[in-house]
Amino acid sequence: MGKRIIIALGGNALGKNLPEQMLAVKETSKAIADLVEAGHTVAVAHGNGPQVGMIQNAFAAYCRQEPSADVMPLSMCVAMSQGYIGYDLQNALKEELLNRGLQQGVATVLTQVVVDGNDPAFQHPTKPIGTFMSKEEAEKMAREKGWHIAEDASRGWRQVVASPKPLAVVELTTIRALAETDNVVIACGGGGIPVIATDNHHLKGAAAVIDKDLASELLAEHLDADMLIILTAVEKVAVNFNKPNQKWLDALTPEEARTYIGEGQFAPGSMLPKVEAAVKFAESKPGRTALITLLEKARDGIDGKTGTRITC
C-alpha cells in the first residue's frame, strides 16, 4: 500500500540561474515521478534560498537606478520565487508523469504561512539566502549593504535573514483537497510567504524567509503524512561533519538527535533545521518516519537502503 509522503526539496538543488533550474527540475521530476509511479501520494515543498536572494538583489539594483522605485519587501520576493519555481517544477513534473502514462494532476498553490511578529528570530537572523560568497566578498556586502552574513556549512559565506517559526498554513484546506483527489501538490514554496495575522483577518507580509524544512514538517503533520522526506546535499546526516572523525548516521532516535543538537553538531540554517523538523515529525504521531537523504536516493531511502531515518 502506498504512503502519503511530503518531500522537502532544497532551493540549492534548483540551480543558480534559470537555465540551471530548467535542467534541475527535470531531474527532480524524475525522482518525484518514481514515487508516484510506485503508488505513493506525494506533495512537494521546496526551498528558495538562492532564488529569493537573486530576486531581492535584482530589485535592489533597479532601485539604485530608479530612486523613486519602491524597495521590494522580502515577503513579495518569496511570493515571486514560489511562482517561477512552481511554474517550472509543475510543468516538468506533469510532462514526466504523462510520459510514463500517469494521469495525476499537478498543481502549485501560492502558500502563506503565519508567523509571530514577536518571534525572537527577527532579532537574530540565521537563514542563508542568495549565492555563496568568499569571506572577503561577504564582508564587503556587510559593510556596503548592512547585510547580516554567516558561513554556511563550510561551503562559503551567505547573507542571512530572519527565519521565524511557522505556525499555520493559510491555504491548508485547499492543499488538502487537491492532495486527496489524486493531485501532486507543490506548496509552501520557500517555506511559505511569511505573514503576520492582524485584526480583521488581515495578513501582513513579514521581512523573513521561513525554513522550508520546518514548514514542510507542519504541512506533513496537517496532511496526516506517513513520511517526511527532507532532501539535502548529502546522502546521510553526519556528526563531526568535514572532520577526520566524521561519522555517517543510518538512523537516529529523537533522544540521540537532541544529544547531537546539544553538542552543536548541526549547522544553524543548514542541517540543524532538517534534524529538528525530522524529530518533530517523528514524534508527532506513532508510526511516522522522517528521512534525510539525496534526491536521487529518495526511493532507496523509502525502502530502507540508505539515508538517515528518524523514528521513535
Language-model-derived ranges and their functions:
Residues 2-312:
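C-terminal catalytic "cap/lid" subdomain
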